[in-house]
């Protein structure tokens, strides 16, 4: 674990996209808006993403790749980077979590943690 691991805060907002979902076909589309806040003293570049997505049936999908939404943003100190993406589940409920592979301005590699967050149809959970 690097001292830089805590320099990035990840905030998440999710939304069920009813118009593009098809419950009768077990296709539930969710969007998620991620805000990555650099609380550190140096710029940090997001190089990779690693997601683990689990639906209510326990089906696990792992997603790894370069950057996010086609970008590898450099986030200056005390600023934030925001993007929106999406995922399709076979069930109306699931969770996602993961990490971003980051590199600091000084070249140190570290992981930014994306804490588990819920994907759920509105009104499904009380």
From Swiss-Prot:
One Pfam family hit: DUF525
Coiled coil segments of this chain: none
InterPro entries recorded: ApaG_domain, ApaG_sf, Uncharacterised_ApaG
ApaG domain ranges (all copies): 2-126
GO BP term (any one): error-free translesion synthesis
Superkingdom, taxonomy of origin: Bacteria
NCBIfam families, A to Z: PRK05461.1
Database matches in HAMAP family: ApaG (MF_00791)
Protein known as: Protein ApaG
Organism, scientific name: Shewanella sp. (strain MR-7)
Gene: apaG
